[in-house]
Design a protein with these regions (language model features):
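Non-catalytic ligand/cofactor/substrate-binding and regulatory segments of enzyme domains
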Residues: 1-17, 122-156
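Non-transmembrane alpha-helical segments in soluble domains
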Residues: 8-11, 30-34, 174
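Alpha-helix C-terminal capping segments
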Residues: 11, 19, 108-110
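Extracytoplasmic/periplasmic, Sec-exported soluble proteins
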Residues: 21-25, 71-74, 99, 158
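Active-site nucleophilic cysteine motif
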Residues: 21-38
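...with weaker cross-activation on analogous glycine-rich loops/strands in unrelated enzymes
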Residues: 40-131, 136
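Short, low-complexity, charged amphipathic interaction modules
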Residues: 155-178
Length: 178
């Protein structure tokens, strides 16, 4: 099984920056990095999901909020998938009415508070593959095809300290933005 750390290293390669969103959307980017890092179906072919909602529902061994990931693993694991999920009942035109939310976007957490993704969002002022803050995402998932080798290495007080640091940084960012 491919290590999630290696998967994150592959995702962070500058060679992906040449792709525009129309060439490689968010799902396509994650799937290309899976393939480029050596992850294959048992028959040797590449994984091909029906979008970020399909990834959210069926490609993960664990999922939760960013705070839950930090509490469980002591940190955000490199190679984790970062999602933007809204609680609007699902993407109904694709048959997702299970109440698990609408995963409208997916990227790859590469460490250092950064996510690699493909977007055409004006908020990021780019069209295609690039990097942005984990703070633009609200949910985390661990892909069942990757080896995260994660364990909670922090005790309760260390976890509280990490969460307090994150809250303080978010507060500082809000003050700057407002």
């Amino acid at each position: 099984m491919v290590s999630a750390a290696y998967f994150a290293e592959v995702a962070d390669r500058p060679e992906y920056d040449k792709y525009k969103y129309e060439q490689l959307d968010c799902q396509g980017f994650v799937e290309k990095v899976l393939y480029d890092s050596g992850v294959r179906k048992p028959d040797g072919s590449r994984y091909n999901r029906r979008g970020s909602n399909s990834m959210w529902r069926s490609a993960l061994s664990w999922r939760g909020t960013i705070a839950e990931a930090v509490q469980k693993f002591g940190t955000l694991p490199a190679g984790a998938w970062a999602f933007i999920v809204t609680d609007d009942g699902g993407e109904k035109d694709r048959g997702y009415t299970d109440g698990e939310g609408n995963a409208s976007h997916v990227g790859i957490y590469v460490g250092g508070g950064m996510v690699r993704d493909s977007t055409r969002s004006t908020k990021t002022k780019r069209d295609g593959v690039g990097s942005r803050s984990i703070n633009d995402f609200n949910m985390i998932g661990l892909c069942k095809y990757l080896d995260y080798d994660v364990q909670n290495v922090n005790n309760k007080s260390q976890i509280k300290s990490i969460l307090d640091d994150i809250e303080n940084k978010l507060r500082e960012l809000r003050e700057v933005l407002l």
